Amino acid sequence: MCIRDSTWTGDIPTEKGIRLKHRERIYQDRKILRKKYKNNKNKYKSEKQKLRIKTGQHFYESNELSIRHNQAINSDAPVFERFWHFWGNHFAISEKDFLPEYATGPYQREIIRPNMMNTFEDMVREVTISWAMINHLDNSNSVGPRSRYGINSQETINENHARELLELHTVSPEVGYSQDDVIQMTYVMTGWQYKWSRSKLETGDIWFNFEHHEPDSKIIMGKTYKADGKRELFTVIKDLANHPFCKKFIATKLCRHFITDYPTEEMITPVIKAWDESGGSLPVIHKAVVKSAFYYSSRNRKFQQPETWVLQMARMFGFSWVPQAEKMKYDFK
């Protein structure tokens, strides 16, 4: 199995390319328009709308939906596309800070899709340190209180990213982690942030800022992790992504998505077995899910998500609402 080629014949903008437009929008708005038209609210609104058009704010999201739906309808591997949608939903990002316009599409295309050919651990690691997820969960605002920077600052930790990594992305609350575990996980993640500058603002590349990282060892769910800078996070992710509770949580969620809202142990067990035998290889896990879905489909009914249902109907009956690629060309002027 290989990464499925895109069926979209038009331009597919890169994450960095779109981020440059996002940077232009933020900088022009904050540093120029607000100052220039501070006494003329109507003119400011008018110029801001022109800036949105110039930087593709309303174009990128529509373009990404066209790429996504074209892929689902026309791909020669619809099952692969279904799994792509599943993982995009599992590692979802919010609608805040213009992320849908400037981040969601390339995040799903460049981070989630390629890692579907790797292990679950690989995917968790790459998602966790992606620009989209770091910004979605405000990890750039998380500063270790005893870090070189934090010890002389009033800034402190932000638990959002650590809590979501534990609760929604890996082991789930069923593992029984405590608030102390969340705090320790947050300490591990301090320092992972966008590289801020006067020109790039919050659109800089992700890096590990040791000056913001909480020093010393951390204890998470009873295990001590030695101080190891940026490698600390990868070590913890390795344990979380291969934890029995994580396997059970993800396998259950996969079966719930593809088979029934109430998956049984006999449905879930083969998926966990495939996980164990393959070291978490997602292609192997996906095959196990498909086998279970095929075996139990005649005895179970599953109400599809609206988007999934419409896309399936489009494939079955040969209709499409997706604009042709040449009609999605955009003039950034």
Model feature map: region roles:
Residues 49-56, 60-81, 85:
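Structured, charged N-terminal subsegments at the starts of enzyme catalytic cores
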Residues 56-57, 70-75, 95-100, 111, ...:
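Short coil/turn segments at secondary-structure boundaries
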Residues 79, 83, 95-103, 135-138:
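Short, flexible active-site-proximal loops enriched in glycine and acidic residues
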Residues 90-91:
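Residues forming anionic-ligand binding surfaces in small-molecule and nucleic-acid pockets
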Residues 4-52, 103-109, 113-333:
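His/Asp/Glu-rich metal/cofactor-coordinating catalytic motifs and the adjacent surface-exposed loops
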